[in-house]
Amino acid sequence: MKTYLEIQVPLRYDAAWFDELRCGCQHTGIKWQTGFYHITMVFVDKTPTDVDLRPLLEKYLNRYSAPTLTFDKLDAFTTMSGMHIIYLTATEIPMSFLSLIEDIRSDMKDAGCIIDSPFRLHVTLGRIKASVIQLASVQEMTKKVSLPAFSLTLEDVDYRVFRGETIYEIKLKV
């Protein structure tokens, strides 16, 4: 089964920069995400059914403090499935956060999980089929937005079945 570990990002849909982005992309057909903003720390393409990953997650997450990330860039990329993803990211990622993610990913692989995609820090804001508009056009629209750098502390982590129930959740200490 497919599973993923995500850390929630408390974004506001009505933030001025997000309104500006949506206005600048009107009439494109972009489907905007209206909530449940998160960073996928690990997407597991195949999770062994006989392995309980909760102890592995607890080993790392019980002692890890909530990271504060400064978001300062909007951009877009194209997925293997042919969707353009409009996203928010941080150009400087704390090393402790990257190390945590790499350690968890490594231990999950050692436990028999198949993880095909590398980590890419992004918060999905919207999606559109690549056949509708060129990536360069979407990227040009994101560059026109006045995005002030802002910092958020990320506390809530969920491990879930892809498009399914939550297996494990924790609130990181602040």
PLM features: what roles do these ranges have?
Residues 151:
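Internal active-site segments that recognize and position negatively charged phosphoryl groups
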Residues 1-71, 93-147, 166-174:
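Basic, often amphipathic N-terminal segments
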